[in-house]
Design a protein with these regions (language model features):
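N-terminal active-site segment of His-dependent metallophosphoesterases
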Residues: 1-65
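Active-site neighborhood of divalent metal-dependent phosphoester bond hydrolases
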Residues: 55-124
């Protein structure tokens, strides 16, 4: 388990509305529907309680969308869930976690990253 632990105080008075969601699991289209449904504004806060990767086909696109929204001035906070933790552990700590991670959808995330790299960076 990663050891980067941080408690952050959020003053709800600093935002017009606060939305909380979780377990998007690579389903980019569902996230887009959520954004359209709530009509996210720059004075709102969107908190994503992790598990943005695995299972669905667009994990990397979700993370890139979060970054894009932040760069555009939207208030988006993403908290690591157990799937992000398994991704990190299997990639950087121990192969023990790789089998477990693949069983819960990590194989889809690896495939998604491979396809993204081939599409955007592969010149061969």
């Amino acid at each position: 388990m990663s050891s980067n632990f941080k408690i952050e105080y959020i003053n709800e008075n600093n935002y017009n509305r606060i939305f909380v969601t979780s377990d998007i699991h690579g389903y980019y289209n569902l996230f887009e529907k959520l954004l359209n449904k709530i009509n996210l504004q720059k004075d709102d806060l969107l908190i994503i309680l992790g598990d943005s990767c695995d299972r669905g086909e667009n994990s990397i696109e979700l993370y890139l969308k979060y970054i894009e929204l932040q760069e555009q001035g939207y208030q988006v906070k993403h908290i690591w869930g157990n799937h992000e933790d398994m991704l990190y552990e299997s990639a950087f700590i121990s192969f023990y976690y790789k089998d477990l991670w693949y069983k819960v959808g990590g194989d889809e995330t690896v495939y998604n990253y491979e396809q993204y790299i081939k599409k955007n960076y592969w010149k061969g």
